[in-house]
Amino acid sequence: MPTAFPPDSVGLVTPQIAHFSEPLALACGRALPAYDLIYETYGQLNASASNAVLICHALSGHHHAAGYHSVDDRKPGWWDSCIGPGKPIDTNRFFVVSLNNLGGCNGSTGPSSLNPDTGKPFGADFPVLTVEDWVHSQARLADRLGISQWAAVIGGSLGGMQALQWTITYPDRVRHCLAIASAPKLSAQNIAFNEVARQAILTDPEFHGGSFQEQGVIPKRGLMLARMVGHITYLSDDSMGEKFGRGLKSEKLNYDFHSVEFQVESYLRYQGEEFSGRFDANTYLLMTKALDYFDPAANCDDDLAKTFAHATAKFCVMSFTTDWRFSPARSRELVDALMAARKDVCYLEIDAPQGHDAFLIPIPRYLQAFSHYMNRITL
């Protein structure tokens, strides 16, 4: 447990909560009359508010992207390798905002929050959300913080989709967009993975139609299975082979169906167990649906280039060679569309064995390329 933080850490951070009482109209046709967004900031906003950077999180992410909440924390925020003094998102230059999206389960209003109309958790009655809904709520947070334009909006995976949506929905409010390990829409295979995960949750007897909190239980089995399926897709075959191979937990096989025999089985069960204790099942359903629904070109005759016609941002698109969840081909599809739309775009394909999760890992070439781009941003 650290008693002193590394010199390139943002150190101790305190989450803040912004309450919004103006109704937020949603794509599903419903509205939230009021809601909270929890967020953290790192660095200082300059006098002209020209150095603000928004971090958009992925499916299971949250607002705590960097630094520590306590001297007793064993781990820093989920993107600490990229945010801090001298790091790619340099807090000596940038004022960084990271939030937990609406519908989340880490402090922003979501399914586990109390519904003021009933006094009970929203549960399955919480409205289905889209990436564009998130961007609208994020824009309100920007207004609250006095930020009229982001120097950059940055995200990996689902976070990259939010960054892209910002350039479409609020084209004049983003100067740079960094979409990392992302895609312009999900493939049929990706939607299928999400559906398997959802069915694992929905068919868990402890789900209770989404009202499990009222029953004092959680659909642990369903969440475990959903996370196990998802986690397989975040890793590459090579990285799993190198880390686990066919290694056994003990010296011999047990010849049954219940024992944890292979090391990879143990790893997946641990990941599922840990996840089921900290994540809300209804939030998981919401996040996967937002992923499935993201398809901005659908509003432009499926013409991706036309989708970005009004974007004014400069784009940086990054992918990783062994990412099969959001493959380099999907990033190149995005780059081709941006070039067809005559946008300023650079593309980086990083050779990395870690698969989709590579965007979270401090790979030297990745950090170097990331830093190089961020250092070019004028404030």
From Swiss-Prot:
Pathway: Amino-acid biosynthesis; L-methionine biosynthesis via de novo pathway; O-succinyl-L-homoserine from L-homoserine: step 1/1. InterPro entries: AB_hydrolase_1, AB_hydrolase_fold, HAT_MetX-like. One of its GO terms (biological process) is methionine biosynthetic process. Keywords: Acyltransferase, Amino-acid biosynthesis, Cytoplasm, Methionine biosynthesis, Transferase. The record marks R325 as: Important for acyl-CoA specificity. The keyword Metal-binding does not apply. The active site is at S157, D323, H356. It catalyses: L-homoserine + succinyl-CoA = O-succinyl-L-homoserine + CoA. Residues 51-360 form the AB hydrolase-1 domain. GO terms for molecular function: homoserine O-acetyltransferase activity; homoserine O-succinyltransferase activity. It is found in: Cytoplasm. Its EC number is 2.3.1.46. One of its GO terms (cellular component) is cytoplasm. PANTHER family: HOMOSERINE O-ACETYLTRANSFERASE. Transfers a succinyl group from succinyl-CoA to L-homoserine, forming succinyl-L-homoserine. Homodimer. Belongs to the AB hydrolase superfamily. MetX family. This is Homoserine O-succinyltransferase. The lineage of its organism: Bacteria, Pseudomonadati, Pseudomonadota, Gammaproteobacteria, Pseudomonadales. The gene is metXS.
